[in-house]
């Protein structure tokens, strides 16, 4: 299963990074250059019919390979911000998605909107890294964490002033997210175990999500009418990556969905 492969490779990488830069040294680097995260809840909470999009900076994926050959992460991010993205998602996983923490740091330096560190996070060190490199919120995938692990990581993120987007794909994942106290719940139409898509997932899961939660729809989103349909179901914002990455002008494609 691809999720297991990514998880194992991420564990290997993390072990190496911890040896190069131990936790206390990573924390000291933050103390010498403090960063104050932005208000992610305010940025993503829908106001009336406003369309809010988390636009993604993504070079590749395990299911599609390289998506964007002419990949300039900063140029893409600036184009997103110019065209009114609510936030930017930055892939930092290097092997399967060709991402980098350096992309996150670079984009933070030149943009003002909230940034999501999108990676396979299972350790507090990765959350501290996210803060050091300039993220305002992190992705936590319910499928790859136990209830207790998810709760612990979510609480640690908040302790640092970060928010978390807790990604779910089924009722079991949703139970974990609610138990952990997630405020932002992402419904991923794509099953990460086999990459199959279920575009009716929001219809199935949203009725079980408390009204106080911010709901994000993820994957397979490229049609304004479908976005409006999901808004009517209660979706606050949309995470869109591959669709924009395949377009010649990602900013123009973003603007067309707003």
Curated annotation (Swiss-Prot):
What GO annotations for molecular function exist for this entry? indole-3-glycerol-phosphate synthase activity; phosphoribosylanthranilate isomerase activity
- UniProt record similarity statement: Belongs to the TrpC family.
Q: Which domain of life is it from?
A: Bacteria
Write out the GO biological process terms: L-tryptophan biosynthetic process
Name of this chain's protein: Indole-3-glycerol phosphate synthase
For this UniProt record, give its keywords in alphabetical order, as a comma-separated list: Amino-acid biosynthesis, Aromatic amino acid biosynthesis, Decarboxylase, Lyase, Tryptophan biosynthesis
Per its record, the protein catalyses: 1-(2-carboxyphenylamino)-1-deoxy-D-ribulose 5-phosphate + H(+) = (1S,2R)-1-C-(indol-3-yl)glycerol 3-phosphate + CO2 + H2O
InterPro entries referenced in this protein's UniProt entry, alphabetically? Aldolase_TIM, Indole-3-glycerol_P_synth, Indole-3-glycerol_P_synth_dom, Indole-3-GlycerolPSynthase_CS, RibuloseP-bd_barrel
Pathway per the UniProt entry: Amino-acid biosynthesis; L-tryptophan biosynthesis; L-tryptophan from chorismate: step 4/5
Keyword match Lyase: yes
Q: Name one Pfam family in it.
A: IGPS
- Supply the enzyme class, top level: lyase
EC annotation from Swiss-Prot or TrEMBL: 4.1.1.48
